């Protein structure tokens, strides 16, 4: 986000929600791949494709429309995770983060809808393989961990402090040099 580094943790939709929306999810998934969009642009445009197909079928708007049922459920199942200096990580439900302007709907909706299409249409093995390709292009990760387990798997937050050592000016590392790890600090995301 513009306010700092953060991640979205999303949970797949339930079988009941899939049964209610299988047709529109299948049409969206098929359209992404039959139009040659695939994993390159699919995560960016999946929500737009869902909206177009749903609108063409006159099922996008309204109380029982796809926007108010499926899309709201996808958002409900997602959380924004951000680092807090001295505390570790904190979360806020994605719908609240959207309401507060911490993240923009258009910045997250495509990837969330794409993930939902992929994870609900395919077998777990197919989903894993497809999302592995997506993660390389879109800097995302797929995991079966719950939100709490996933946060626990993140690196421990440590303030950047001087070690007293002189920084190396070499641009190359030797094979005996341990790789340096990135230090994660506060994302300064207001909640």
Segment roles from a protein language model:
Residues 1-3:
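Short acidic-hydrophobic surface loop/beta-edge motif
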Residues 6-15:
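Short, proline-centered helix/strand-breaking motifs
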Residues 15-191:
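Short, surface-exposed, charged amphipathic helix/loop patches that serve as local interaction elements
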């Amino acid at each position: 986000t513009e306010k700092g580094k953060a991640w979205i943790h999303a949970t797949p939709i339930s079988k009941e929600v899939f049964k209610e929306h299988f047709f529109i999810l299948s049409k969206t998934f098929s359209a992404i791949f039959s139009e040659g969009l695939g994993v390159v642009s699919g995560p960016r445009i999946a929500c737009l494709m869902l909206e177009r197909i749903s609108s063409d079928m006159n099922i996008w708007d309204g109380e029982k429309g796809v926007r108010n049922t499926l899309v709201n459920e996808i958002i409900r199942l997602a959380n924004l995770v951000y680092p807090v200096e001295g505390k570790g990580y904190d979360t806020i439900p994605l719908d609240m983060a959207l309401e507060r302007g911490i993240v923009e709907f258009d910045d997250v909706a495509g990837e969330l809808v794409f993930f939902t299409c992929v994870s609900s249409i395919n077998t777990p093995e197919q989903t894993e393989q497809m999302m592995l390709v997506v993660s390389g292009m879109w800097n995302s990760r797929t995991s079966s961990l719950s939100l709490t387990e996933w946060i626990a798997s993140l690196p421990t937050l440590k303030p950047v402090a001087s070690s007293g050592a002189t920084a190396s000016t070499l641009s190359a590392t030797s094979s005996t040099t341990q790789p340096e790890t990135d230090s994660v600090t506060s994302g300064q995301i207001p909640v």
